[in-house]
Design a protein with these regions (language model features):
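N-terminal Sec-pathway targeting helices
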Residues: 4-18
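Juxtamembrane cytosolic interface motif at the C-terminal end of transmembrane helices
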Residues: 11-12, 25-33
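Acidic/polar low-complexity flexible segments
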Residues: 30-92, 149-247, 291-335
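Short, well-ordered beta-strand segments enriched in hydrophobic/aromatic residues
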Residues: 86, 130-137, 280-286
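Beta-strand-rich interaction surfaces with strong enrichment in secreted/lumenal proteins
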Residues: 120-123, 269-274
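A mature extracytoplasmic/lumenal domain signature
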Residues: 126, 137-139, 161-163, 286-288
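Short amphipathic, basic-aromatic surface patches that mediate peripheral association
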Residues: 138-146, 292-294
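Exposed beta-sheet edge/beta-hairpin loop segments within beta-rich domains
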Residues: 271-278, 296-301
Length: 335
């Protein structure tokens, strides 16, 4: 009996310590958790009049951002656009540039803990055929790599597809549309598919049944046989992230919250990126097609549109949720 009493006492003591430890962890988390600030575009001092004004949490994590005035973007109408396949076209020098501060994504894990890109420049224009946006930001050296320890530079533009959609990648029944460009994909277009031999030129060697030739066997040319592609599961299942014959360095996505990004196949969006003298210049282009749900939305209310931006610094190991972002930014489309 005495032994049973001692066992119960020990169990109660251990249980008590466990409860105390959990309580302390919870208290420390609450006490040290970064503050969350709601930041809503407010032209004229009223947020209610804007489509997509989110009531959800902001990802800035900085109270000062709440008081900072948001930039205003005007998508100018031109008779003739700059070249849609050349982000370095000198004609962009004649189009107004808006400088936009960036913040760290700190709403959902994995969060960005260190800001390495402070701001991004945006220019926007359209004509009867196309809508175009040019983004540029400082990047001392471009990052194209994609392996377990190295990551690619990237940038994205996001638009709400329904009034009230949070800028944090939308929400249930409040979708957003995104255009996502990646430096690695640009290199695929410019120089050919960046194969395993490109990442590990002096160390990679393997054997795949049914692949043509002897190792190293380039994925882009040695795996035409469907039997060989069984060993490349992403390619054989049509995963858009595994595409080896990419036609554009851009992906159109739809989302309704964190972790819900979905590829839009056969997208009409095009993009082109170029790195020059310590800066990336990325040009997005979208046909002016009234059947396109986003373009249709633009013309339903051209004075009260919005966009948000995201930038990934590959050299700083940005990827996924580890990114620099903006809140919704008011945008008007000139008629």
């Amino acid at each position: 009996m005495a032994g049973n009493d001692n066992s119960r006492r020990i169990a109660l003591f251990v249980g008590g310590l466990f409860v105390i430890a959990i309580t302390m962890i919870a208290v420390i988390y609450v006490a040290t958790r970064r503050p969350v600030v709601v930041v809503v575009p407010q032209p004229g001092g009223e947020a209610a009049g804007l489509p997509g004004a989110a009531a959800g949490p902001s990802a800035t994590g900085e109270a000062a951002a709440a008081a900072a005035p948001l930039p205003q973007i005007s998508q100018v109408r031109l008779d003739k656009l700059p070249a849609t396949d050349d982000p370095l076209d000198a004609a962009w020098d004649q189009i107004a540039t808006v400088e936009i501060p960036l913040d760290m994504q700190q709403t959902a894990a994995p969060m960005l803990e260190q800001k390495t890109v402070a701001k991004i420049n945006l220019q926007a224009a359209h004509d009867s055929q196309q809508f175009v946006w040019r983004l540029s930001w400082e990047q001392p050296e471009p990052s194209y790599k994609s392996n377990v320890a190295q990551f690619s530079d990237a940038v994205a533009i996001q638009f709400p597809m329904k009034d009230g959609a949070p800028y944090t990648m939308g929400g249930p029944d409040m979708p957003v549309s995104m255009m996502y460009w990646k430096a690695l994909w640009q290199k695929d277009i410019d120089e050919g598919f960046q194969d395993v031999t490109s990442v590990y030129p002096n160390s990679w060697y393997d054997l795949y049944w049914f692949a043509k030739g002897t190792g190293p066997q380039p994925v882009s040319s040695a795996f035409d046989d469907p039997a060989a592609r069984q060993y490349l599961t992403g390619v054989s299942t049509g995963n858009p992230m595994s595409t080896i014959d990419r036609k554009q360095p851009v992906q159109e996505l739809a989302a309704h919250g964190f972790g819900s990004s979905t590829d839009i196949p056969n997208s009409p969006v095009t993009a082109r990126g170029a790195w020059k003298e310590g800066r990336w210049y990325v040009l997005f282009s979208r046909p002016n097609d009234s059947v396109d749900p986003l373009i249709k939305r633009f013309f339903e209310n051209p004075e009260q549109q919005m966009l948000a931006l995201a930038v990934w610094d590959g050299a700083a190991q940005n990827r996924g949720g580890r990114k620099h972002i903006t809140n919704w930014i008011p945008m008007r489309i000139e008629k």
